[in-house]
């Protein structure tokens, strides 16, 4: 049985214990003897990051085990499997693993690039059992290095995998505020009290108590601290987001930005290996960060209505079911199939977080769900599922647009053009599901682009930036020549040529509108129009020139991104833009 399947079997136990902890906290809060440590958005975010970590481990886990096995095969000094599979061998391997884990964990707090991976586990400002499941998706990229001593010593890969899972599962129960000090146990083992210290941002607790199972490593190496004052949780640079993708990327992005901006070549490297918080002097001078003050710490709790919270909980439950099914069968799936479902589940988790932040409406989340399922089913050839979700995605987006633009201040022509473009696209989606209706489908999308040209011309006129028109027509001409020489049938050369001209004009109109308006919303619409060109280019290449791997994945992903960027961000002419782009002209 694989680790992923063991995690699946352990999931009901995890949720049972989370439920018990939640009820205990609520009761203690009512009695005045404790407090409730759970907030629904934070819990969904932590559990969602746990799901993302597990489903991505289907890919990254191969790296970790593969490199370990290769090293063991080549360099093992004592590869006696009989010894290592006796009780004393298992125990020695577990202690050995825990020692290696201590140093990985410690360097994860003392080296910025390793902190970039580990920070995910510390971002929650609450401390409960859901925090235990909040794990990184990038830790395996470098973490395997710290376990190579086990491979060289001769610990077999199977034994390594089992003790790694035991060490990980042990750490689940220590993430709670509902269990106090445990006397002698605290002196030898990682316990709730010891691990609360590790998660705290108090000055006296920073970079302490790294042990996974045994706390004696911290006592031996001088990093132990007892819990002697209330803990404040989170990180000193709070995430302030429910976005699981950004949670994994935020520190990498900050390091890359500082590395890019510093002028000294040595600092471009040092920023990655120095302790977290270290910054090149020249970067810190132009972009200083305020000193941490624990008295200023505020919990991130954006307002979300009860209905949105209920929807997010239901959405998460469905994503959890999908992730469980994926983990159970992942060992039998081809790599491409795993990548497709990983992308679909990630899209759903991202959309759930965005809804809880108020960045997406429920309708937009439903569109993303339908689009993800349409894309996945199309890429994997699941015809019946694709036949349902491909038209459903655009139908949901039409409903969203009707609701968003029905206000009296929205001009009727603006709304009609947007809806016309979406309805024509829906008709094209349906027709293109049958190869014999390619030309009628092409005509529907041509009409959609004409509607979008009229929509984007509102308030700015036709083609306000001739250079943009020249560029998109040039790109279209190159693509058309590529199709022509690649085998475009003679009967399709005129309709496809006409379509290329119209979609290029649509993209040029969107780009020109963005240049005139100068706001982020119009820029997103322009990106959407460009995605439309990319999607259709991929579709035509796959149909007429050469077969692309999992073509439907790339075609539909860019197509749905295009439609959402247009429908969600296009604005009537004259509407005030609160997200005006900064003026990039030089100042005097």
Model regions and ranges:
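Membrane-embedded catalytic scaffold of the fatty acid hydroxylase/desaturase
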Residues: 51-63, 83-240
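Alpha-helical bilayer-embedded segments of polytopic membrane proteins, i.e.
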Residues: 3-21, 42-66, 89-98, 137-168, ...
């Amino acid at each position: 049985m694989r680790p992923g399947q063991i995690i699946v079997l352990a999931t009901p136990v995890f949720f049972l214990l989370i439920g018990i902890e939640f009820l205990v906290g609520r009761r203690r809060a009512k009695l005045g003897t404790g407090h409730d440590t759970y907030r629904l958005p934070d819990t969904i975010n932590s559990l969602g990051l746990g799901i993302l970590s597990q489903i991505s481990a289907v890919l990254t886990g191969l790296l970790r085990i593969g490199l370990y096995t290769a090293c063991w095969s080549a360099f093992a000094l004592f590869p006696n499997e009989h010894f290592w599979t006796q009780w004393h061998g298992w125990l020695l391997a577990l202690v050995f693993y825990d020692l290696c884990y201590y140093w990985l964990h410690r360097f994860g707090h003392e080296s910025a690039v390793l902190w970039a991976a580990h920070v995910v586990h510390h971002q929650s400002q609450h401390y409960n059992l859901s925090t235990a499941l909040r794990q990184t998706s990038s830790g395996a990229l470098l973490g395997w290095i710290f376990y190579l001593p086990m491979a060289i010593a001769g610990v077999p890969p199977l034994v390594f995998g089992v003790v790694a899972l035991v060490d990980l599962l042990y750490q689940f129960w220590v993430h709670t505020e509902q269990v106090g000090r445990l006397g002698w146990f605290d002196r030898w083992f990682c316990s709730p009290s010891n691990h609360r210290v590790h998660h705290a941002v108090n000055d006296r607790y920073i970079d302490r108590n790294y042990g996974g199972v045994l706390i004696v490593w911290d006592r031996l190496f001088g990093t132990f601290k007892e819990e002697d004052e209330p803990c404040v949780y989170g990180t000193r640079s709070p995430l302030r987001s429910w976005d699981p993708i950004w949670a994994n990327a935020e520190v990498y992005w900050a390091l890359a930005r500082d590395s890019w901006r510093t002028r000294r070549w040595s600092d471009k490297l040092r920023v990655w290996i120095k302790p977290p918080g270290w910054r090149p002097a020249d970067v810190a001078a132009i972009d200083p960060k305020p000193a941490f003050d624990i008295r200023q710490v505020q919990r991130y709790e954006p307002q979300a209505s009860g209905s949105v919270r209920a929807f997010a909980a239901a959405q998460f439950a469905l994503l959890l079911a999908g992730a469980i099914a994926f983990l159970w069968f992942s060992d039998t799936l081809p790599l491409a199939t795993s990548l497709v479902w990983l992308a679909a589940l990630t899209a759903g988790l991202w959309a759930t977080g965005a809804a809880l932040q108020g960045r997406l409406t429920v309708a937009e989340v439903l569109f993303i769900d339908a689009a993800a399922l349409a894309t996945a089913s199309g890429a994997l050839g699941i015809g019946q599922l694709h036949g349902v979700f491909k038209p459903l995605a655009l139908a949901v987006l039409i409903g969203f647009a009707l609701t968003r633009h029905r206000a009296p201040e929205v001009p009727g022509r603006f709304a009609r053009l947007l809806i016309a473009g979406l309805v024509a696209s829906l008709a094209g989606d349906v027709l293109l599901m049958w190869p014999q209706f390619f030309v009628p489908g092409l005509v529907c999308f041509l009409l959609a682009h004409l509607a979008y040209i009229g929509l984007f011309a509102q308030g700015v006129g036709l083609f306000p930036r001739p250079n943009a028109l020249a560029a998109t027509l040039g790109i279209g001409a190159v693509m058309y020549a590529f199709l022509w020489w690649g085998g475009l049938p003679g009967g399709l050369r005129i309709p496809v040529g006409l379509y290329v001209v119209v979609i290029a004009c649509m993209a040029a109109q969107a780009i020109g509108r963005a240049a005139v308006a100068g706001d982020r919303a119009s820029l997103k619409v322009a990106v959407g129009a460009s995605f439309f060109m990319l999607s259709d280019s991929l579709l035509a290449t796959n149909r007429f020139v050469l077969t692309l791997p999992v073509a439907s994945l790339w075609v539909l992903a860019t197509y749905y991104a295009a439609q959402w960027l247009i429908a969600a961000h296009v604005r009537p002419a004259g509407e005030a833009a609160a997200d005006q782009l900064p003026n990039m002209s030089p100042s005097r």
